[in-house]
Amino acid sequence: MYMKNLNKITKAIIMLGLLSTASLSAFAQDMSNGADNFYQSDSVAMQRVTFKNQYNMTVVGNLFIPKNLDKKMTHPAIVVGHPMGAVKEQSANLYATKMAEQGFVTLSLDLSFWGESEGQPRNAVSPDIYAEDFSAAVDYLGTQTLVDGARIGVLGICGSGSFVISAAKIDPRMKAIATVSMYNMGAVNRHALNHSQTVEQRKKLIAAAAKQRDLEFGGGEIEYTSGTVHQLDKDTHPIQREFYDFYRTPRGEYTPASSSPQLTTHPTLTSNIKFMNFYPFNDIETISPRPMLFITGDKAHSKEFSEEAYRLAGEPKELYYVKGAGHVDLYDRTALIPWDKLTEFFSKTL
């Protein structure tokens, strides 16, 4: 039943303009430009770690430590957040590994309700708890003998870009903030891309979620929404093809033990509506004078969010375009991801 619901919602999203243009091959995975989501490094040690957030929920992460790190000193650290609907094994581990190769202690994490982290129901949306998870990661890193607690930064990919901004506004321990292919998860749910969704259309989505709450409270099955399609056909929109190529092929597909291939990437319908009340860019200027870096592909359908955040943020700030890159390209295409820019940013600011 949930797949029928997903198909209806996907069609509605396309009609609302949430999906725009991009071009990828229809069915075969595209491994161009060094796509290497599951990259591992011989020079970096990884260990699974757990810690509690302030809601006493267990958050699970991977801690990456350069093998040649001077154990007699403390070092800067970076928390890395995965795309919305993904898990740490998708994009976040890659970024954490690559930045550890540059000498940083890094920590990728599963947001609550996703992957190995606690939270019921699975795939639930809670922007406040997501932001809290990043602060909890800073809590954890601050206890590590190799980490300088005054030199911790955050890096959010896709939806996590908006979550790290939300967290950083009220957590000054996050000394430097970077986002890659950021989605403002509040704005995209309220307005769709390019503000193509009307208030009346938004109200229909809210009403549908409220109706579903009644059904589920009465014992009905949980419904899931949005996420990535499971099959392609001639009518599949180019942006869904872009996501499909990562999430539904060996390029980036990963199903954690807490989920199933049918449910990965799909948040629950009744909780996803909470994004309507999520305004991460409000008061973004109060993060200043802590530095911010916004990275987006110049071909990315999502670039409006990085551009808007840059416009609103206080100094120091930088908006960096990756030439020829789309939104999902910056999840794993190692030849396109600007590692030098990220290394320069965090080296100077932490």
Give, region by region, the residue ranges found by the protein language model.
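Short beta-strand element of the alpha/beta-hydrolase
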Residues: M73-P83
